[in-house]
Amino acid sequence: MNQKLADAINTQLNYEIESAHVYLAMQAYISTLGLEGFENWFGIQYEEELAHARKFIKFMNDRAARVEIRGFETPRNEFKSLLEVCEVSLAHEKGVTERINNIMSIAHEVKDYAAISFFQWYVEEQVEEEDNFGKMIDKIKLVKDAGLYLLDKDAAARVFVPIPAK
């Protein structure tokens, strides 16, 4: 594997682990609000980010590329509201989208067609992630505090679906 691409993938897989901790911190904050459904929802978000990292690791290992696990920054632990948590999450996911697009650009540059195919799934996943958070923000703004109970029940219905390794 081209070294520039391997470096970018290593950076992203570590960012996925960092993202998991971001969502874990958000889940911990939400648990103080008594919103068990949203607590569940963000717990699943945490699991998904770890699954993404594992998928990157498998891809790197399958390509005989060196995986480098690094440290990460302490995530933010305090927020003003569920709405702020979701707004921060949307901004975070937009940053992930930018990173994935950068990796796709490198894969195209070095003509690594296996990486292009692999990362297409992530391109589509990011469209879904941004859409989910955007819709959640819209709903929270629409119902305000009085309707959070019903939204919380909807969030409780989310289940973790394991991501196929390939």
Predicted regions and their residues:
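Iron-associated oxidoreductase/ferritin-like identity signal
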Residues: M1-K166
